[in-house]
Amino acid sequence: MESQQLSQHSPIFHGSACASVTSKEVQTTQDPLDISASKTEECEKVSTQANSQQPTTPPSSAVPENHHHASPQAAQVPLPQNGPYPQQRMMNTQQANISGWPVYGHPSLMPYPPYQMSPMYAPPGAQSQFTQYPQYVGTHLNTPSPESGNSFPDSSSAKSNMTSTNQHVRPPPILTSPNDFLNWVKIYIKFLQNSNLGDIIPTATRKAVRQMTDDELTFLCHTFQLFAPSQFLPPWVKDILSVDYTDIMKILSKSINKMQSDTQEVNDITTLATLHYNGSTPADAFEAEVTNILDRLNNNGIPINNKVACQFIMRGLSGEYKFLPYARHRCIHMTVADLFSDIHSMYEEQQESKRNKSTYRRSPSDEKKDSRTYTNTTKPKSITRNSQKPNNSQSRTARAHNVSTFNNSPGPDNDLIRGSTTEPIQLKNTHDLHLGQELTESTVNHTNHSDDELPGHLLLDSGASRTLIRSAHHIHSASSNPDINVVDAQKRNIPINAIGDLQFHFQDNTKTSIKVLHTPNIAYDLLSLNELAAVDITACFTKNVLERSDGTVLAPIVKYGDFYWVSKKYLLPSNISVPTINNVHTSESTRKYPYPFIHRMLAHANAQTIRYSLKNNTITYFNESDVDWSSAIDYQCPDCLIGKSTKHRHIKGSRLKYQNSYEPFQYLHTDIFGPVHNLPKSAPSYFISFTDETTKFRWVYPLHDRREDSILDVFTTILAFIKNQFQASVLVIQMDRGSEYTNRTLHKFLEKNGITPCYTTTADSRAHGVAERLNRTLLDDCRTQLQCSGLPNHLWFSAIEFSTIVRNSLASPKSKKSARQHAGLAGLDISTLLPFGQPVIVNDHNPNSKIHPRGIPGYALHPSRNSYGYIIYLPSLKKTVDTTNYVILQGKESRLDQFNYDALTFDEDLNRLTASYQSFIASNEIQQSNDLNIESDHDFQSDIELYPEQPRNVLSKAVSPTDSTPPSTHTEDSKRVSKTNIRAPREVDPNISESNILPSKKRSSTPQISDIESTDSGGMHRLDVPLLAPMSQSNTHESSYASKSKDFRHSDSYSDNETNHTNVPISSTGGTNNKTVPQTSEQETEKRIIHRSPSIDTSSSESNSLHHVVPIKTSDTCPKENTEESIIADLPLPDLPPEPPTELSDSFKELPPINSRQTNSSLGGIGDSNAYTTINSKKRSLEDNETEIKVSRDTWNTKNMRSLEPPRSKKRIHLIAAVKAVKSIKPIRTTLRYDEAITYNKDIKEKEKYIEAYHKEVNQLLKMKTWDTDKYYDRKEIDPKRVINSMFIFNRKRDGTHKARFVARGDIQHPDTYDSGMQSNTVHHYALMTSLSLALDNNYHITQLDISSAYLYADIKEELYIRPPPHLGMNDKLIRLKKSLYGLKQSGANWYETIKSYLIKQCGMEEVRGWSCVFKNSQVTICLFVDDMVLFSKNLNSNKRIIDKLKMQYDTKIINLGESDEEIQYDILGLEIKYQRGKYMKLGMENSLTEKIPKLNVPLNPKGRKLSAPGQPGLYIDQQELELEEDDYKMKVHEMQKLIGLASYVGYKFRFDLLYYINTLAQHILFPSKQVLDMTYELIQFIWNTRDKQLIWHKSKPVKPTNKLVVISDASYGNQPYYKSQIGNIYLLNGKVIGGKSTKASLTCTSTTEAEIHAISESVPLLNNLSYLIQELDKKPITKGLLTDSKSTISIIISNNEEKFRNRFFGTKAMRLRDEVSGNHLHVCYIETKKNIADVMTKPLPIKTFKLLTNKWIH
């Protein structure tokens, strides 16, 4: 109701009074809240004038006409009752509206005066009078009274009323508009200040003096709500109040900041628009002022460009500087720096002239002695020749006289010239110089720059026979005290100080010189046209130029006033110091301080700054005249040159000389781009570009690596191409200083061919702009082409090639020609060009059958280099072809993506564009032979075998195992092609790694081959193999990559009416003998399976093994088949081609016979796991044996062993001494001591940062009350075992900050001083990985926190003492500890108990049983690692509530709140995590490894090819005796500790694929032979090469809301020393790898089955613990699975027969495993060995197998 009435009775008017106050305040630099009395009067005047112009309403009986002259009845406020504040007494609404006042505007509606609401208010006594409100109380801001047009006066106008009596406090007006809020805040703050509450209000320069009380907060809230109605508040104020309606202080602080910011910006713009400079202040001060304003505006988001800034500056120039814009009018691209350079030059010249003026001054006594003694101050003859202006010369001379009489301090240029001209000069009657000036009566001693002189120019005088100049700066070969007498036209003598040469450097690089005389006693610098004529230079006043007799223009002439001038910029400055041309008195100079001395004393500041400081007395004791400035100009301080060295500036257009000096193709720029990651091996990772300087013609070549021979091949190719195609020889090649260009091989090649290499300077990439810009342009085009076409990323270089062809054909805006035209080539025929990625149909000239479709869908890439064809990508064949046999696909909807490309590609336009080219082909078409191969050789694209073991189906469709009919034939009509078949995949399949992307020269394609064999060119032959497949399901022509890689399973839905045997062609793996298997019905299949008996013989090795998972069904373990399938679903298992199933009998469930005499598998024996696993071929595939690891170590053996087998016995010299040496090896120290970081640190900057960190740590220790500061103890009084040594350690963190930590020496702490039973717990890595995985699947927010000085929050129970820090200087004293100092044995446990108690009691958390440092409640999960916390929750507000509670007790910093929906990067416990909520998570350590590995001093990048696997099968560690010296042994063991320590850290964090190699080498840390070290180097090299790899997780999309926990187990029997087995396990949660383990079995197993049982039994306990943790954190059902590739192990687990257990140990192990499986509801399933990713944990694998097993989950 009140707000409605207010809106009815309070119309909003924007009065002029408030506007005037605002405009006045923004022009000042004072506090925006400071309203002075001077402003009050001015604002009152403006307000009165504004109000007098407003219309008034008729007067009312209730309210006077003008409330400024008559006050309404004051409010009667009763005495306080029942509390500190009075009771409210308000008029009702009807009473208020009778008088016409708004509801909140009437004084009697005020509950009590504001000063009475203040907590400082004291109730009045019986005789006290209540204060009366002023007559304008309660009126609206900028709103007139209902009866009057007068607006409410501003706060400044009422200041006198406020201060007139201490008992009167003027209330603020009522806010009526959001736009007036900031002005209202000013008045409101003044109201609070007058209410004695100013000390609780923050200002722009300081914080509040004290905290407010509850009563004061109530007062603020009440008055704010009373005078600022909510409907008139700005939105940002409402946002603050919506969070906390009592947070008035935040509103006031933000308002003050807004006012301060707005005021500063307006002041800066106003200052810039009103600049004024006339040379009265130093030029550097003016430059600093303007530069600061421009920088401040730019930082505030108001950039001022060069043109506008120069206009502001030039508009503010006056005096002699007003001619500067005229002198700069020819400069088009003028910058602020150039303009200030001219101002500085003019200022220095002006100061020099003033100093010279004071050097020649007559004394009155001299004038009395000789009335004819005077100096020449008249004008040149050219002035007097104008008869119309006879009096100008006299007036100008008078003005010059006024300037010259001003005394100025000497300057650095000509202060010593005074020595020869201080005495009066007597005129002589010689006529050596005739200047043609008329006689005047002036008695001026010296003339400064005249008002009509053009600064920085020479006056051209045709009547002068000699050239005169006032400054000695341009005189060359000067000689002092010349015997020359010079007079002017009035026969007056002109004193000459020196004679020399004036050297010119004109526009055409012409240099010439004339004689010049130096004198400071002339009005202008005169340039004699007679002397110019002597050197063949004349002045043409019609063209206003200086020119030679042949018409060559040398310099422009400027006409200013009545005279002609030429600029001094063509004068060459002299290298001779000024004193050499002056008569310097030795006694005078020796009394002055030399400038180099002052320069060094004043911190190597520049001369200009020093002089300015002396002139303004900021440096005292001596004056500016006490310094010898003669050497200031030419002085070069060597220390300044070294310490202040900067890069050179690149001048725009500096490369023009190269374009003018070289012919086309003689000067090339080159650069290399790359590498591009996550591409197949066959795709190029780099490209090298070349650009011709003159024509801008470009070439690009693909590169797979940056080796010397690869670069040399490209250089050889392009040089031969240029020589043969353009008949040109390359003379210079510009390149950067990369190792690929600076190597000796390339250097010799260039030297042999007479080519000059031009390298850029170190760290100067801008000098290589041509090549760098080209690479950037090509990459932009590449990304655009791939995005537009939807082609996979491995075709990126095709996009580069296409862009290069087009860019060479486009005209340059600068040269108006294309690069091809500059090179003399014809323009690009656009009719031969297709859009990149254009769908086409390519003719298949040699199909596999006559009824097979002849058209293959493809995508056009770019014209061929080697033929008249086009390069086309065929997704179905995984390769590119060079062909002319293609037809453009017309269907626009058959584009690569789902986007509408109608606006991008128009088929009608494309047909019209290519019509002529197609007709040309049709008219010249010849009969093609049947054996014509569409695959031609071309040098940068080729086949892409995404699935090397699958055949290339020209239909881009694989036959599904469930299809019942052969594929239907396709017609040749392109319009009938299935649109889904021409859609290219967006990403390359992860299995594409061993293929070749360059097309092969020749491939045989003979049909009906009974086997798939690898050809020399890397292709695969196609064959037809019948497959047992159901016939009931219909075949579809749509296929995808997913359908090709699906696991084959037996279908339970075979049709009963289909009993015919049908041979279905199917591809098979390479090297497999395939047979034609008749297709049968389901019943026949079951009969065959039942009646077949198990056998283990050689015949079984010829059949194919199961590539899919074979679940083992039992009533206890796997009651339903869908449960088994769900366990396998979504696991990152490798994709294998489908194979025929293996028939199994019921007897499979029986326990197989165990051969106790089975041979060691490492020596060639066959284990139990091979009993039912068929061997693909007796010969091992060549691809299985291929490896890229080139053994460069001469100690590596090549014996045929399966593993890196350690020796059976490690022999050393002095075994006991060696063990002692290991114990004495100190751990790696990554920190610095106090003396290293501060005392003896020579790096000053680093030392200062460490000192700052030191003081910060000390302050933190004192703040936390770490020790008792009240009492210091004597060392002799304290038990020594209770004294803990302490020290400061310093280190530099990964983020670049310097850290100091005061720690205790816990390593020497006495056992009696701590409880050994206490534990310092941290979160387990598996718990962290589990929490991260659940966060991804549940769309959780992840918040990372850090608690500063966490240990210091925990109290210490024991009585311990430490020595004080070094800065206290009390070495003999001790202080008692009160807090848990870092380094103490009990500090970690104390902190854990402290934070655990706080989280449980104050935050409502509970710790998960069995998992320390994992806390949870119904909404939030917390993982604690010492002082780091990671919070997980569905709702971010839940995390914020926990943070607020933590901040109440601890200094908590939010490292990453995790509120963004985009990708967020974390650094959690060493893991670099990239997380996009609801999509993916990537875990890696690239930055950390990039920083740490180079510090290990490992020889990275050894000779040989890049490693593709961490180890090589067939290598083992030699058993040779280790003979080492003791010191050498210590050093090598220390090195092994560092290397294996880092590798273990990385492996157990996320690189689980390396754990086998890490575990094997870790067993040899005490056996550091050369072979072991070399193998360790190879492992570190592989980690370095793959440091960018990441553990990839994607959000799971389960069919049912359940969690799936799976462990995959494997064992390698007897492959470790003493026939121990290696076991490995990988744990997966919802398809994401969360952990792995590889270790040597603790017991010796006697068979592979026993080893597998041991591996499984080791994995079950952790599997159960993880299951409990998952159920605690996520209340969903959980499915637990156990996968193994040992069928015999599965049969033992599910069998009830114990008779065949051969020993007690084996039986008890198996029985326990049975109980665990049944009791924990584990689903045990079989997984084929080829798909068992845990295989990488137990043995070294070939490269192909290693990649196949790991590329799905780490890449």
UniProtKB/Swiss-Prot annotation:
Site-annotated residues for Cleavage: H401, N402, N582, N583, A1217, A1218
One annotated GO molecular function: RNA-directed DNA polymerase activity
Active site: D461 (for protease activity)
Any one annotated GO CC term: nucleus
Segments of skewed composition (Basic and acidic residues): 363-372, 1044-1053
Compositionally biased intervals (Low complexity): 960-969
Region of interest: RNA-binding: 299-401
Domain RNase H Ty1/copia-type: from-to ranges: 1610-1752
Main location: cytoplasm
Region (Integrase-type zinc finger-like): 583-640
Keywords, ordered alphabetically: Aspartyl protease, ATP-binding, Cytoplasm, DNA integration, DNA recombination, DNA-binding, DNA-directed DNA polymerase, Endonuclease, Hydrolase, Magnesium, Metal-binding, Multifunctional enzyme, Nuclease, Nucleotide-binding, Nucleotidyltransferase, Nucleus, Protease, RNA-binding, RNA-directed DNA polymerase, Transferase, Transposable element, Transposition, Viral release from host cell, Virion maturation, Zinc, Zinc-finger
InterPro entries: Aspartic_peptidase_AS, DNA/RNA_pol_sf, Integrase_cat-core, Retrotran_Ty1/copia-like, RNaseH-like_sf, RNaseH_sf, RVT_2, TYA
PROSITE patterns hit by this protein: ASP_PROTEASE (PS00141), INTEGRASE (PS50994)
Compositionally biased residues, Polar residues: 20-31, 46-55, 137-168, 373-411, 1005-1017, 1031-1043, 1054-1082, 1095-1106
Compartments reported by the entry: Cytoplasm; Nucleus
Its job: Capsid protein (CA) is the structural component of the virus-like particle (VLP), forming the shell that encapsulates the retrotransposons dimeric RNA genome. The particles are assembled from trimer-clustered units and there are holes in the capsid shells that allow for the diffusion of macromolecules. CA also has nucleocapsid-like chaperone activity, promoting primer tRNA(i)-Met annealing to the multipartite primer-binding site (PBS), dimerization of Ty1 RNA and initiation of reverse transcription.
Note from the entry: Retrotransposons are mobile genetic entities that are able to replicate via an RNA intermediate and a reverse transcription step. In contrast to retroviruses, retrotransposons are non-infectious, lack an envelope and remain intracellular. Ty1 retrotransposons belong to the copia elements (pseudoviridae).
Quaternary structure (record): The capsid protein forms a homotrimer, from which the VLPs are assembled. The protease is a homodimer, whose active site consists of two apposed aspartic acid residues.
Entry protein name: Transposon Ty1-BL Gag-Pol polyprotein
Species this chain originates from: Saccharomyces cerevisiae (strain ATCC 204508 / S288c)
